[in-house]
Amino acid sequence: EMLRSLSVNNNRKIPEARLFELSHVYIPVEGQELPDEREILTLGMYGNGIDFFGLKGCVEELLDNMGIKKAEFRPETENPTFHPGRTARLFVWKNGERKDCGILGEIHPEVAKKNECPQRIYVAMLDVATLIEASSLEKQYQQLPKFPAVTRDLAIVVDDNAYVADLMAAIQEKGGQFLENVSLFAV
């Protein structure tokens, strides 16, 4: 349904769109007569300046607003609906347990063409129950620090095959309680 909505917007000469949809998806389960019903939040977007990282940023903002502190994006190459080099699977943690929360990325050009969509369509499909289960909206009071924060920009060179999630985890582990924020970018 999301691809159809994006296609309609594109065909009406709307230069960019950012849409969301909340719907039920029925997934067949081997050995069961009835399928598994899941509520899915779908985000879809296209337009100038919109790319995978823009979509990922929207998902990260959602996770932050829901109080989900630990999430991981891993490359996904097996889903034929998505472009294999521009897709990630999202995992979230609750009580130390990693849960598959969904997928996000660029729709495969062949799928976009079949649906009469512009070439670069970005979609995220997130399991609502998993998001809610991992969320924590409790606000905690934090005392102001005795000393002002120090911001450091570090430039490091890493192997092209290194995963951002692994780098973030290593930096956060070594930074410990004194590290407040890590932001990675590529040049």
Language-model-detected regions and their locations in the chain:
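Polar, glycine-rich mid-to-C-terminal structural blocks
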Residues: 1-30, 38-39
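A carboxyl-terminal module marker
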Residues: 19-20, 29-31, 36-42, 49-187
